[in-house]
UniProtKB/Swiss-Prot annotation:
Active-site residues, as the UniProt record annotates them: H469
Record text on subunit structure and interactions: Peripherally associated with AMPAR complex. AMPAR complex consists of an inner core made of 4 pore-forming GluA/GRIA proteins (GRIA1, GRIA2, GRIA3 and GRIA4) and 4 major auxiliary subunits arranged in a twofold symmetry. One of the two pairs of distinct binding sites is occupied either by CNIH2, CNIH3 or CACNG2, CACNG3. The other harbors CACNG2, CACNG3, CACNG4, CACNG8 or GSG1L. This inner core of AMPAR complex is complemented by outer core constituents binding directly to the GluA/GRIA proteins at sites distinct from the interaction sites of the inner core constituents.
This protein's encoding gene: Cpt1c
Species name: Rattus norvegicus
Positions that bind CoA: G551, K552, S553, F554, I555, K556, G557, C558, H559, V560, S561, S562, D563
E.C. no: 3.1.2.22
Expressing tissues: Expressed in brain (at protein level).
Superkingdom per UniProt: Eukaryota
Cytoplasmic side: 1-49, 125-801
Protein name: Palmitoyl thioesterase CPT1C
GO molecular function: carnitine O-palmitoyltransferase activity; palmitoyl-(protein) hydrolase activity
Keyword entries, A-Z: Acyltransferase, Cell projection, Endoplasmic reticulum, Fatty acid metabolism, Hydrolase, Lipid metabolism, Membrane, Synapse, Transferase, Transmembrane, Transmembrane helix
Amino acid sequence: MAEAHQASSLLSSLSSDGAEVELSSSVWQEIYLSALRSWKRNLWRVWNDFLAGVVPATPLSWLFLFSTIQLACLLQLDPSLGLMEKIKELLPDWGGQHHQLQGLLAAAVFASCLWGTLIFTLHVALRLLLSHHGWLLEPHGTMSSPTKTWLALVRIFSGRHPRLFSFQRALPRQPVPGAQETVRKYLESMRPVLRDDAFDSVVALANDFLRLQAPRLQLYLQLKSWCASNYVSDWWEEFVYLRSRGSLVNSTYYMMDFLYVTPTPLQAARAGNAVHTLLLYRHLLNRQEIPPTLLMGMRPLCSAQYERMFNTTRIPGVEKDYLCHLQDSQHVAVFHQGRFFRVGTHSSNGLLSPRALEQQFQYILDDPSPACPLEEHLAALTAAPRSMWAQVRESVKTHAATALETVEGAAFFVSLDSEPAGLTRENPAASLDTYAHTLLTGQGHDRWFDKSFTLIVFSNGKLGLSVEHSWADCPVAGHLWEFTLATECFQLGYATDGHCKGHPDPALPKPQRLQWDLPKQIQPSISLALRGAKTLSGNIDCHVFPFFHFGKSFIKGCHVSSDSFIQLVLQLAHFRDRGQFCLTYESAMTRLFLEGRTETVRSCTREACQFVRAMENKERTDQQCLALFREAVDKHQALLKAAMSGQGIDRHLFALYIMSRLLHMQSPFLTQVQSQQWLLSTSQIPVQQTHLFDVHNYPDYVSSGGGFGPAHDHGYGVSYIFMGENAISFHISSKQSSTETDSHRLGQHIEDALLDVASLFQAGQQFKRQFTGLGESSGWKYSNLSCKTVDPNIPKSSTNL
């Protein structure tokens, strides 16, 4: 098989005595280097875990403590109050000549015990500090004296240079809300979207639930919260993602490249820099040298989702998938024009340079060999229903185990697409829509959807990222993507001719072509999967539009939360689009807690509906609408803060539902809750998490974010990102098959709603619509649309990577 890239070093010959195997020196060298890398990696992992575990202390603090104890002993003082003498008695008797050594060992043991006790005390104190969420409830943009004191203590107990996983032992566990309060909030959220008779029916079911099932379910859930790291996250991963039997196309999300700039038009060069940067990130991740994410620059978030970022594959099962995570991987799997390749990422000198990786990718692009039978569309199986793929995978594993293991064991998947993508001068609107659609679905057979993420490199040098959702949520993948774009462009850079910097390596082994010896019996399954994938892809309606009339700076000037501002705009736009209110899903993170993931903010509140109705009522004045707008913003902020502090609605009800199923309890109320449909699913894409470069100094280097598919056949998926201070980008998705939705129509309503809401803050001066769709007056900077090579002398970020 092609997996054996050192086959030329393994010489086999037959003699009369049987088979003889001669191992050449290069094989022994490779075995030695592999073992050395493994030992070094394991030692680094142990050392980094140790450093993360003792934060805020350091090994130097132990040395200082030990030296202080020794100094006290020299001064004939006993800081241990007799404990060191007890320790000496427990040590072996080595004779009088080793009395001094016994004293040193006793002092070291006492110093270690005292040091460990101090660290434990600091961890307990830090956990108590991090359990405080009162700062979340303060008015937007203000900080009271108690909060300032709390923040100062958090910084003191956090240490000077915390590592990525330093806070994991100190993070509090996610609390289980009270059942009465959760049900009350749920009924409050349902009131705006239900008729009176339907609402009365839900109230009756809720009362029965609180009286009959809630006490027992709540008790068991409390017991689980005491025993598990998080009372809901493991069930969320299993039942929402891994037990889902639908296509992964429905749950993936994507991220885009820079909007205006393409650093190089050379596909292989961009792939080389990007892959090198991603593996640099993995190196920093393994050594825990990535700083932990701090909310508002002060409160650490859980970093557990980073652990399965690389070397991870979702393996299909008949009833349930599972995530296979490897400790390390020394290659990436590459797909190009129906063919699979293995590209090694390391040599005896470590990680390959960007120029060496470019050389490997260029070889693949230049390779004229055709795809093997059944190979071209094989990846369509990963887009098939999971149970079907699980059954076919057994046959693939039997006949092409080496190739399958190579793909599933890769650090990540790389797709070298044959078409260009990105913003174009000729048709900016349509080009962005096509770009988003390609990132979300591909052609149905050119993405290995099981991998944790797929790096997509287009023929004109544009990049994109497609992410499988089960292992992590958008902010974690977004952190990786920000690092990748900033580092490969600003830190690594490109030569003046567009190639990666450095020199090719003529001695580098060529990429290995994977061989798929597949039986013809799986041809119908591949064809069926391909038809299904193309049907799913063709049914997705994607629309991306940047809005340039104003952005975050203007919203800040209105003294309201930017996220709440957009959420109310979406409520107004959706009402104009559908003529009714609906359940709205906004994703909020719960990473303030250990292994926290997300919670739902139900943005369609009574206050939001009152504001929307006022905006549609010509008899209401701007002052009245503005007052209702501020009430709706305050309500949304309260819901968002409650969700972030573990007092949300939906994850608690979800956990109660799973517990009822495990206990074989029938709850019509919980069944009704879980059957509700989210017709509007929204999310804000985080930006500037890494601070590797200042987007204000380089306004052309903004990304238009990313998006996801709709959660319902007749619903919308809407994501948004603030591009700098003066622009907002929206990604809208819906189903072509629905007669009730239209992504472009909703986009126009969002644009109108943004202008109408902004006009409320202009003291009677209306924002004038300057364009319909995307035209020259919309603020598009046509001078920046070219995909030319970036000036290699561009100023670099001051951040030391």
